[in-house]
């Protein structure tokens, strides 16, 4: 059972909401009271895939002496080394990871997918193993960005000064928690000089593919 983190008092019933994040400063109620005009809008963004030209691909080679090499289209070879060595019980000092030509990533190639499988097969076969996802496997097996539902409320003076702003953002995270909702909260009003603001982010778990990073995960929706 999952209980929402970041809520006070702590919930006593489980739900599909993993976490609540809040950021901001000032007095939004006073800011709205001082406004000449208040505008409220709701927006939705759809789940989209990074759509990189080259699919996920790797070449793994595990030697009898325990040393191993992994050539992989990755944006984060150190995290790949950490995850793969941990999953397979390899000595991290003996695993060398080389980032090959990425072929596009946009955040989607920071995550480990089939690489541990390639290493395990190489260790079993005592031969190098190459693994390349088909385009269908990329869409089925890797993660797109979150879809969102966002409510915005802003107050302003007649001279254009924004007196208060509130954003409530619900991020669809797929079947597992972890949507970087905090980055959305950090982004929502970062470009503006608003003395009274509050951003709330919800990490919502649903029966859909697990999401992955896509160009500053969770931030573009909030910036929009």
What kind of feature is each model-predicted range?
Residues 1-224:
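Structural alpha/beta core scaffold segments of enzyme domains
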């Amino acid at each position: 059972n999952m209980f929402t983190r970041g809520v006070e008092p702590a919930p006593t019933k489980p739900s599909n909401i993993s976490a609540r994040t809040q950021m901001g400063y000032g007095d939004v109620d006073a800011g709205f009271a001082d406004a000449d005009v208040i505008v409220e809008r709701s927006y939705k963004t759809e789940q989209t895939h990074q759509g990189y030209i080259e699919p996920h691909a790797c070449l793994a080679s595990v030697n009898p002496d325990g040393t191993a090499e992994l050539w992989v289209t990755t944006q984060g070879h150190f995290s790949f080394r950490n995850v793969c060595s941990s999953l397979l019980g390899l000595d991290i000092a003996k695993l060398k990871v080389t980032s090959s030509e990425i072929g596009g990533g946009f955040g989607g190639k920071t995550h480990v997918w089939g690489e541990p499988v390639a290493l395990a097969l190489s260790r079993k076969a005592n031969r190098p193993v190459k693994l390349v996802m088909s385009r269908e496997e990329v869409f089925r097996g890797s993660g797109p960005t979150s879809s969102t539902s966002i409510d915005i409320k802003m107050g302003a003076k007649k001279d254009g000064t924004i007196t208060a702003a509130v954003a409530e953002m619900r991020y669809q995270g797929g079947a597992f928690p972890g949507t970087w909702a905090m980055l959305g909260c950090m982004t929502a009003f970062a470009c503006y000089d608003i003395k009274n603001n509050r951003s709330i982010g919800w990490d919502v778990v649903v029966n859909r593919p697990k999401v992955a990073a896509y160009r500053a995960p969770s931030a573009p929706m909030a910036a929009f």
